[in-house]
UniProtKB/Swiss-Prot annotation:
SUPFAM superfamilies reported in the protein's UniProt record: Ribosomal L11/L12e N-terminal domain, Ribosomal protein L11, C-terminal domain
The species this protein was found in: Leuconostoc mesenteroides subsp. mesenteroides (strain ATCC 8293 / DSM 20343 / BCRC 11652 / CCM 1803 / JCM 6124 / NCDO 523 / NBRC 100496 / NCIMB 8023 / NCTC 12954 / NRRL B-1118 / 37Y)
Function: Forms part of the ribosomal stalk which helps the ribosome interact with GTP-bound translation factors.
Molecular functions per Gene Ontology: large ribosomal subunit rRNA binding; structural constituent of ribosome
Similarity section: Belongs to the universal ribosomal protein uL11 family.
HAMAP family per the UniProt record, alphabetical: Ribosomal_uL11
Gene Ontology biological-process entries: translation
Family matches, as NCBIfam families: L11_bact (TIGR01632)
Name of the featured protein: Large ribosomal subunit protein uL11
PROSITE patterns for this protein: RIBOSOMAL_L11
Modification after translation (UniProt): One or more lysine residues are methylated.
Quaternary structure and partners: Part of the ribosomal stalk of the 50S ribosomal subunit. Interacts with L10 and the large rRNA to form the base of the stalk. L10 forms an elongated spine to which L12 dimers bind in a sequential fashion forming a multimeric L10(L12)X complex.
């Protein structure tokens, strides 16, 4: 008989830096997860992605065992690595610029986690994240133009 999922915990943790300290420890403790076992497994699985924030979805079963799925780093985190920072006032102050090729690379990386049917739609989602961070795409101010992606971007 299959195990019954009793709880799902979603967290964003720095890769290879999960510790029993807050905020990770209390969230896992409330769910009844063996904190030491989770941190050891998470740190081992994400060791190659050091420096990134990794979203993780932990399914807790009725026998207090668990399994977890790591996702790709958030688009905002990937854009921040390229640009260096986000803007506190995205409509007036621009934080930096990215190219369409960089947007495409992020979209291809995140494609499995995005609700998009093709790469163009995924690129538009990443472009929206860039807009909210005050980042221009190929010099195009997305708050004015709306999009820098042409229909033939594929």
């Amino acid at each position: 008989m299959a195990k019954k999922v009793v709880n799902v915990v979603k967290l964003q943790i720095a890769a290879a830096k999960a510790t029993p300290a807050p905020p990770v420890g209390p969230a896992l403790g409330q769910a009844g997860i063996n904190i030491a076992q989770f941190t050891k497994e998470f740190n081992a699985r994400t060791a190659d992605q050091a420096g990134s924030i990794i979203p993780v979805e932990i399914s807790v079963f009725d026998d207090r065992s668990f399994e977890f799925v790591t996702k790709t780093p958030p688009a905002a985190d990937q854009l921040r690595k390229i640009v260096g920072k986000g803007s506190g006032e995205p409509n007036t102050k621009k934080a930096g610029n990215v190219t369409l090729d960089q947007i495409r690379a992020i979209a291809e990386n995140k494609m499995s986690d995005l609700n998009a049917n093709d790469i163009t739609n995924a690129m538009r989602m990443i472009e929206g994240t860039a807009r909210s961070m005050g980042v221009t795409v190929d010099g195009v101010d997305l708050t004015v133009e709306g999009t820098a992606i042409k229909e033939d971007a594929e």
